[in-house]
Amino acid sequence: MKLASWLFGIASALAGLFDLIWAEFEPAHQPIQAWSDHIPGISVLARIAAIWLIGAGLALLIRPAARTGAAALAVLYGIFCFFPLPRLISAPRYFGHHPAVYIGVLVSVAQNLILFIAALLLWLHLTDPGRISRTVTILARILFGLCCIDFAFGHFTGIPATAAMIPHWIPLGGSFWTIFTGIAFLLAGLAIITGMLDVLATRLLSLMLLLFTVIVLAPRAFAAAHNHVPWGSNAYNLTAVAAAGILSASLTISREQAPR
């Protein structure tokens, strides 16, 4: 749990740092623009959120402040979950009422929902590690698993866009890896929800996300050094790596504490 907690904090702080440098919410993972292209004081709000992410993220690295940091991140990531919601109405108007459109919007929600779940579990663990209720664990498991399943369908319905991100030097082609990782997300989601090999699934999920960061996202950031999105995507993905690790640790602890 400690390593995942530290990575969660560092990656959150990095996301905040990039938001602060560009003085904006990162459009791909903090899509506040879904509400309006002209929100008064948006740059001020972005700076406040950036400082919040930096402060809360760094607090996770300091034992006495970690509980407060986890709570602060849970609040902010919970707020981020609402950013894409207007697109459930606006996106179909532009792109039609296709399943892929709704799945894509829900992917944006799920991206922050898994971070909210991880931050909440971390806060509960830091508050009283022996008192995380079975109900909370089950609810976290189901929501996280459903998010993974949504990511899977996002891959299946957006093969061309996702495949284009895969470097050409990787064998078998982008479409193969898009489908492969989609299946991996689907199996991970089902394992997490059902509790069958759930800890293994979360660890493999964390590894897959880490490899995606190293192989795909990191080179894109250096290739577009003045673009906020690639840098923010790297920070986000590292936070997601940590989120899967936090869930894995939480499931392990819950299993160890269960009556035999």
Where in the sequence are the language-model features?
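Membrane-interface interhelical connector segments
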Residues: I21-I39, F156-F176
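Extended, low-polarity transmembrane helix blocks
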Residues: M1-F25, G41-G55, A59-T157, F176-L187, ...
